[in-house]
A protein has these predicted regions:
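C-terminal motif of bacterial Sec signal peptides marking the signal peptidase cleavage site
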Residues: 13-16
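Sec-dependent signal peptide recognition
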Residues: 1-8
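Bacterial signal peptide processing site
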Residues: 18-20
């Protein structure tokens, strides 16, 4: 419960409310896009590679993208300027540390 409150508080610090989050699928390749125009750095971690941090790429509109993900089930979260961020995702799953991760389910 306390960890959940901390995550909610961090969301407020990052941008006032949860950033918009979009999933795009092209030819079975998944791209996740996070709208966080004021962020300096965004990293992505997923269960695909044991939550190894990988940098997201920022475009001119402040959207951060992580491309080339397989269209398979996985859990994930972002680090925005060093702070854990769960966007407003459709599915969430409890992690092993008392918090939660977003969960992607193939379409």
């Amino acid at each position: 419960m306390i960890r959940t409150l901390l995550v909610v508080a961090m969301l407020g610090l990052v941008g006032g409310c949860a950033p918009r989050h979009t999933v795009m699928i092209v030819d079975q390749s998944v791209t996740l896009i996070l709208q966080a125009p004021n962020a300096s750095t965004v990293q992505f971690a997923s269960s695909i590679d044991r939550f190894k941090l990988r940098p997201a790429t920022k475009d001119a509109q402040g959207n951060w993208a992580v491309a080339g993900l397989g269209n398979q089930e996985f859990q994930y979260f972002y680090l925005v300027d060093g702070q854990v961020l769960l966007p407003d995702c459709r599915y969430r799953q409890a992690d092993d540390f008392g918090a939660a991760n977003c969960r992607y389910l193939p379409r």
